[in-house]
């Protein structure tokens, strides 16, 4: 039986930001193929979804790193997409320095934006495949639905542009929650436009067109109510890249949508099983 050891780790970016994470090792050793996972909006590396699946992936032989970007947790609205996405390279550097030869890069929710963004920007040869848990299609559309429709979204965009034109783009306001009952998050006006505005690049359906021939696995719970995961996200993603496998979990009772479904609450074993089956099919064995 594999014994999983856990290390709390920290990596420092070139501009001095410390990024924390947890490394799960099978029998205390690095595997040839490692997995690196990054969280979504408002989340941390220790979110329950990662805390439950990472040790099981390690039990299967894959050294697995769950790590923050600079825009983790309440910092989401303070840092631009590009800078945060590039932080993922620190996690890859860390795994490579420990002996990993190839890496499966993945993310949950907004992490399904930053993972393909990083690959599209760098074409990092260490990344052999991508995992998209609670895959988003287009965060711009999700933000419009969050705002309550096209008209209120246009007004939010207008206000942000007005603030930036007045030299006040770094002022803070509070964005509404993505779904009722979720947590509202503070945003700078300039970061709102960068991540959620009409010209934002936070569009996985576009980004995955630029990841080369790397295979991708996207998974969604049909009860997930988060706007950017809703149809036509699946259709957009599948049309964008023929190498993408999209898995929609079977419906469960109750059939009503619920925020916890975005985090695969109670369905973590299914996620691990789908992930391991896919990796085996690709021939990406741990060692």
Task: Go through the PLM ranges and name each one.
Residues 102-159, 190-191:
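Primarily recognizes the serine-hydrolase "nucleophile elbow" in alpha/beta-hydrolase
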Residues 163-272, 276-280:
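Serine-hydrolase catalytic core
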Residues 31-40:
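Short beta-strand element of the alpha/beta-hydrolase
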Residues 1-29:
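N-terminal cap/lid segment of alpha/beta-hydrolase-fold proteins
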Residues 54-74:
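Conserved alpha/beta-hydrolase
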